[in-house]
């Protein structure tokens, strides 16, 4: 362990402030009363955070590089810092081990931290504090618009939790896109205006994404990740994510200027080989706390007020951050640790090997997975309605899907990833988070993309050699779970369509689905390990 500032530790250390890899915010609640004459900051790079799940090279690189840049900024301030580097010979490999060492060496009177984003990490650090009989002061994460307590108040007495009601309450609380107590434009939700595809002509000339060339710190991290986690999926070669606050602010400005105006209309659209489209690519910077959501939404709202971006685009973007982001955090912290065990549909199939390689004949999955491995990124429809949908229809064990999502994406922190995966994508919580399972046949993907045009499978066919696995599995899913789905009014239309199929057609679909599942089960192995 070493002090990267080169400053002497305060002789009687009042507070050791713990800063985690997703808490890179100089205005964090844990630092509000920081006194460099009495306090010190603790940060630690450990193998545990890249190996408790198989973290992709892009994900490990973004966390480690952002942490080292944050540490360098603390050094400029002259703040005492204990920083454990991953490659240090005495690194224990775990957060608990590194914190135990720091406490034993420097004997702080108290530990302080902002509430973490991972239940496992919270329990680990609490156990260390308890072992040393130290007070651990866990402060509300003021990065967010709402507290967990406020979410609990909202949830109390409700039989079902739904995003829309919580989102409206936060709009009223914050005044974002509000006018005279009413939503700007006279309605809360412009989803119906935000579902366009690119059509046969495609997206045309797209604005380039923000790219940040690796500096010396990032290059050092890239080499370390490549050497230490060579067997992990993905590549460090295309790394260009923002890893400092300055870069994150630049990425925000670029999104507002170049992509926000078209974001809403095309937020659900996909196109072969086009990774970035009109999306913000800001979720990683937000989840590392390099950006504050207030400044992000203020910039978006200003773009609407100045006539730069239409209301449906801005409202759709606001809902992702003020709505979904806050909502899933509330779900996570009010239902952990048991939430992680949910498997309402008793799905047990293994995750297919091609999720770690992209080697599949299904064009939509191949494109989404290969770009995920190359960049640590896919937009929300690719995650929900391609990789997530296939896993749901196939019947993959939701915990395996969760570990894949948590490991491969640069923006993945458990508080946001787990509810999105188990609740929204896999319906493993039985409807706690979402009002229905998000299922569709291959025709949805055909409507929203050009993937099917170059695919050997036909989205209109459920049986036969050219049958699209999405379509086959969609109908089979409806048959397998018909009794459960019949209790949900939002699924009745899909079940009526199922009931129109002749018995012999349903039998043929069930047989083909069984054959496909067996083939995927036999092909599943341990590619990532």
Regions flagged by a language model, labelled:
Residues 7-8, 20, 27, 250, ...:
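C-terminal catalytic domain of photolyase/cryptochrome flavoproteins
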Residues 2-86:
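N-terminal beta-strand-loop-alpha-helix module at the start
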Residues 27-31, 53-55, 93-96, 121-126, ...:
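A short acidic (Asp/Glu
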Residues 62-82, 112-113, 375-399:
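Hydrophobic/aromatic-rich, well-ordered segments within soluble, folded domains that form packed cores
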Residues 49, 172-285, 463-471, 482-529:
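A eukaryotic "domain-start" boundary segment
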Residues 78-93, 354-357:
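Glycine-rich phosphate-binding "P-loop"
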Residues 44-45, 135-147, 415-423:
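A generic structural motif
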Residues 94-241:
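Beta-rich, aromatic/charged-enriched effector core domains that present basic-aromatic interfaces
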